[in-house]
């Protein structure tokens, strides 16, 4: 099934992913991250308290969940110092910003499928896109793709289901 999604995916995005394995930030993004870090490094020691990670991320427009923060802290603060330097913070934020870009790209792709704007990808939507891309997929193969992504069994693929299958198949 995943191979069917790979076949129908636009090659440019998967090729782009292979060419740039490490996410790159613009100078402006790096500056924003530096400013958020400096805001919480009030004493100028070059470190911030890991407890402030959530607030610093919020300052950059992210809404991290408690579990997500705990995981990040355990990955960064291996010695258990309770402190994080700018390099660690930059690494975390580079990852978060690239994930945000990825999600936005996936949602743009979703909208290309969902041309009737129902908020779902139907069999008809998928068949149209496959035809536009010149993919010769049988109705059975197309239905398999829907079935693989469709978690709630309504016969269509929602935005969340589409995000999940695209990330699961590592197409983005």
UniProtKB/Swiss-Prot annotation:
The segments labelled Required for self-assembly in the record are 2-25
Show where the EF-hand domain sits. Answer: 28-63, 64-99, 101-136, 137-172
Q: Could you tell me which residues carry Phosphoserine? A: 20
Q: Which UniProt keywords apply?
A: Acetylation, Calcium, Cell cycle, Cell division, Cytoplasm, Cytoskeleton, DNA damage, DNA repair, Isopeptide bond, Metal-binding, Mitosis, mRNA transport, Nuclear pore complex, Nucleus, Phosphoprotein, Protein transport, Repeat, Translocation, Transport, Ubl conjugation
Q: Name one GO molecular function term.
A: calcium ion binding
Query: Can you cite a GO biological process for this protein?
Result: centriole replication
Return the annotated region ranges for Disordered: 1-30
> Which of this chain's residues are annotated to bind Ca(2+) 1?
41, 43, 45, 47, 52
Please explain the role this protein plays, according to its UniProt record: Plays a fundamental role in microtubule organizing center structure and function. Required for centriole duplication and correct spindle formation. Has a role in regulating cytokinesis and genome stability via cooperation with CALM1 and CCP110.
Give the record's subunit note. Monomer. Homooligomer. Interacts with SFI1. Interacts with CCP110. Component of the XPC complex composed of XPC, RAD23B and CETN2. Component of the nuclear pore complex (NPC)-associated TREX-2 complex (transcription and export complex 2), composed of at least GANP, 2 copies of ENY2, PCID2, SEM1/DSS1, and either centrin CETN2 or centrin CETN3. The TREX-2 complex also associates with ALYREF/ALY and with the nucleoporin NUP153. Interacts with USP49. Forms a microtubule-associated complex with POC5, POC1B and FAM161A. Interacts with CCDC15.
User: What additional remark is attached to this entry?
Assistant: Binds two moles of calcium per mole of protein.
Protein's recorded name: Centrin-2
**Organism of derivation:** Homo sapiens (Human)
């Amino acid at each position: 099934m995943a191979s069917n999604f790979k076949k129908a995916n636009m090659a440019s995005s998967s090729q782009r992913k292979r060419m740039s394995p490490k996410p790159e930030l613009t100078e402006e993004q790096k500056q924003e991250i530096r400013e958020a870090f400096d805001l919480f490094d009030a004493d100028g020691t070059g470190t911030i308290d890991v407890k402030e990670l959530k607030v610093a991320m919020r300052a950059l427009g992210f809404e991290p969940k408690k579990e997500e923060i705990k995981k990040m802290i355990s990955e960064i603060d291996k010695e258990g110092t309770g402190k994080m330097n700018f390099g660690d913070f930059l690494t975390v934020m580079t990852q978060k910003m690239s994930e945000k870009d990825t999600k936005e790209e996936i949602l743009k792709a979703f909208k290309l499928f969902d041309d009737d704007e129902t908020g779902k990808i139907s069999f008809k939507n998928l068949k149209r896109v496959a035809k536009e891309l010149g993919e010769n997929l049988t109705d059975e193969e197309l239905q398999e793709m829907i079935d693989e992504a469709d978690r709630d069994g309504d016969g269509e693929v929602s935005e969340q289901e589409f995000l999940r299958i695209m990330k699961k198949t590592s197409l983005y």
